[in-house]
C-alpha cells in the first residue's frame, strides 16, 4: 500500500536547546496543552491516592508524566509543580526521608554511573508502593506511606494486618527504620511474558479501601533500605533475613561492572519471580548517615528500568494509503519511539471508518506495542490534543477494477499495482521496490501498468537515481519477465483468483480464459459464487481487455493469436 502523501496533514517539530523533541506550538497553545495534561495527571493522581483506583495504566501515567516534563522544559517552564507524586494528605513525618532513585537510560549510562563507585549491589526494582517501617523496642510502631518523601499517610493499622510483614524484631533491628516496597505476591511471575499487571495500582487500592482485611494476605514486603544499618552488606542482608525479610537477601547480588548488572537484569526479566518488577536498582553498600537523606538526592543508588511493553507515541501526521485493490488504509506517522530495540515511526490504523472511530489527529498521544512478527499495533489513544485538525481522506471510488491506467487521481493505486506485479507473487522482478517504480513512472510517465515493457536500456539508464549496475539489473529483469508463464502474467493483471486456482484451471492462453464460464470458475479451489462473479467482471473490464491486446502485441506468452 502506498502513502497518499498529498493528503497528509501533520505537525512540525523542533529541537529545544536541551535536545528534546518539542512540538512547534505557538506560545498560547503550548501553555494550554501543558495545563490540560497537567490537570489530567493531577486528576488521575488524586483518584489513585485517595480512592485506590487506577484510571489509567501505571506505565501510561509514568510516560505521560515524562512527556509533560519534556513539554515544560521545551518552553522553559518550571517542572517542580509536575504532579508525579502523591498529593500531600498525610502529615506523619518520616524519621528518614525517602530519596527516590535516579533513572539510567541504558547500559552506557549504567557504566558511567558505576565508574568510580565501589562495593556495588543490584536488586530487582519491585513494582509496588513504597513504605517506611519503624520498629521500636522490638515492635512495629509505625508504618508510613511514601507521600512526598518527607511525610505521608499513617498506614500502621493496615500494615499490622499484612501477615508477611514482621510485627516484632530483635537485635539491631529492634530499634530500626526500614524502607521498602509493599508488593502483590505472585507465584512464578515472568515479567517479560506477563508484564506489569498494574501491580502498583492494585496494591494502592488494597491499602486505601476499607473492610478488605482478607485481601491484605496477598501482599508482601521487599526491604531495599536500612538507614544507618550495618555498613557491611552481607551482614545487613543476613540480619534482615533472620528478622523475616528474606527476599532482600535472596535477591541482592554483588556486581563489579555493567555486564554483571545486565545479566542480572535479563535474568530477572525472564525468570519466575514472586513479584512484579520494572527494572533493577544498583546501590552502593556505603550510604551517608540518615540525617543527610533528602528527596531526589540519593546519589548512591540508581535504577535501570525495563523498556515498556508499550510506548506512548505522539502522532505527527495522518496519511492515507491506497492498495492495489482500491482499499484506503490510514497510517499514523509518529515521533519515533523504541520498542524492543525496534524504531517505530508509523502504525497502521486500518480503514477510514476505524480511524474515524478512534478519533485520532496530529498531536494526539497513542499507546503503541508490537504484535506478531514485530508489527507495530495501536492499543489506545491515551491523550487527545485540544486542536482536532484532521485531513480529509481521498474519495472512496477506488476498487479492484480501477487504476490499471495512470491518471492524476490514480497515482497511489497505480503505484501499488506496479509494486504488486513486481512481487514474487506475480512476475518476481528482483530489485524493483516502490522507490524504483516511482522513479521510473515519474521520469517516463507510464500510460498503464505494463508500459515499462516498452522502455529501452538507454531510457532505464537515464532514470535519475539509477546507477549503472542498478539500471542493467532492471533491464535484465524486464527482459526475463517476458519469459514468465501465462499464469504469472494473469496474476500480474490482478485476476481475483489464487495461483493454485489458476493452476487447477489449466488455462495457458487468454483465448482459453475467455471461453471459461462462471460455473467453471466456481468449481476451482477456494472459489465460490461471489469470487467467480468477480472473475467474470474482471475479464470483461475494458481496461483488462485493452491490456491483453497490448501484451499480445508485445509477444507475451499466452496472449498472441
UniProtKB/Swiss-Prot annotation:
Reported function: Catalyzes the formation of phosphodiester linkages between 5'-phosphoryl and 3'-hydroxyl groups in double-stranded DNA using NAD as a coenzyme and as the energy source for the reaction.
EC number annotated for this UniProt entry: 6.5.1.2
Protein keywords: DNA damage, DNA repair, DNA replication, Ligase, NAD
One of the record's GO molecular function terms: DNA ligase (NAD+) activity
Active-site feature positions: 125 (n6-amp-lysine intermediate)
Catalytic activity: NAD(+) + (deoxyribonucleotide)n-3'-hydroxyl + 5'-phospho-(deoxyribonucleotide)m = (deoxyribonucleotide)n+m + AMP + beta-nicotinamide D-nucleotide
One of the GO BP terms on file: DNA repair
Protein name: DNA ligase B
Family the UniProt entry places it in: Belongs to the NAD-dependent DNA ligase family. LigB subfamily.
UniProt xrefs under HAMAP family: DNA_ligase_B
Pfam families in UniProt: DNA_ligase_aden, DNA_ligase_OB
The gene coding this protein: ligB
Annotated S-S bridges: none
